[in-house]
Amino acid sequence: CKGKGQSCSKLMYDCCTGSCSRRGKC
C-alpha cells in the first residue's frame, strides 16, 4: 500500500488505514 511508514498530515495523506497517527506517520 502507498504511504506506509512515511510522514503524513490530516489534510493530505495516502495511508493504508486512511488516517494518520498522532506522530504524523502512516
Curated annotation (Swiss-Prot):
Residues modified as Cysteine amide: 26
Main location: secreted
Entry note about domains: The presence of a 'disulfide through disulfide knot' structurally defines this protein as a knottin.
Organism: Conus catus
GO MF annotation terms: calcium channel regulator activity; ion channel inhibitor activity; toxin activity
Expression sites (tissue/organ): Expressed by the venom duct.
Localization: Secreted
Intrachain S-S bonds: 1-16, 8-20, 15-26
Transmembrane segments: none
Family as reported in the entry's similarity comment: Belongs to the conotoxin O1 superfamily.
Protein name (database record): Omega-conotoxin CVIC
Function field: Omega-conotoxins act at presynaptic membranes, they bind and block voltage-gated calcium channels (Cav). This toxin blocks N-, P- and Q-type calcium channels.
InterPro entries recorded: Conotoxin_omega-typ_CS
Record lineage: Eukaryota, Metazoa, Spiralia, Lophotrochozoa, Mollusca
The entry's keywords: Amidation, Calcium channel impairing toxin, Disulfide bond, Ion channel impairing toxin, Knottin, Neurotoxin, Presynaptic neurotoxin, Secreted, Toxin, Voltage-gated calcium channel impairing toxin
GO cellular component assignments: extracellular region; host cell presynaptic membrane
